Design a protein with these regions (language model features):
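Non-heme di-metal
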Residues: 1-127
C-alpha cells in the first residue's frame, strides 16, 4: 500500500516555455527506458521473488520510479503549458499538439507511443 504525499519528491518550477526540450524529455516518461516502463517492470517482477525482503525492495524501487514519473510529467507540463501557436509551429511540436494539445502523453521522443512491449516480467527471479 502507498501513502501518497501531495508534493513532488523534488520541486519543479520551470518558468520558460520550451516545446523542443519537452519533446526530448518526454521520452523519459513513455520511451522504452522511461519511468513508466521502469515502474511497471519492478512492480510486476516483484511477484516472482521467493524472498519477501527482495520483493519489498522491488516494490520500493517501483514506487520510486512512479515518483520520477510524476516529476517528468510535471516538467513536460510546465514546458508546454503556455504554448503559443507560433511556438508550436516553430518548434516542430505540431504533430504532438494536434493529438494531445498540452496534455502529457507517454511516448518516446520519436513520437512512438508507450507500449507494454518494452518491458518484461518472468517467473524466474534470476532473469
Amino acid at each position: 500500500m502507498w501513502n501518497y504525499e501531495k508534493r513532488l519528491e523534488f520541486p519543479v518550477n520551470i518558468k520558460r516555455t520550451d516545446p523542443k526540450m519537452a519533446q526530448l524529455i518526454i521520452t523519459q516518461y513513455g520511451g522504452p527506458d522511461g519511468e513508466l516502463g521502469a515502474s511497471m517492470r519492478y512492480l510486476s517482477q516483484r511477484f516472482a521473488m521467493p524472498y519477501k525482503n527482495v520483493c519489498g525492495v522491488l516494490t520500493d524501487i517501483g514506487t520510486e520510479e512512479l515518483a520520477h514519473l510524476e516529476m517528468i510529467c510535471t516538467i513536460v507540463h510546465q514546458l508546454t503549458r503556455d504554448l503559443t501557436p507560433e511556438q508550436v509551429k516553430k518548434s516542430g511540436f505540431g504533430a504532438y499538439y494536434v493529438d494531445h494539445t498540452a496534455g502529457v502523453w507517454p511516448q518516446a521522443a520519436s513520437g512512438v507511443p508507450f507500449s507494454a512491449a518494452t518491458f518484461q516480467s518472468v517467473g524466474d527471479p534470476i532473469t
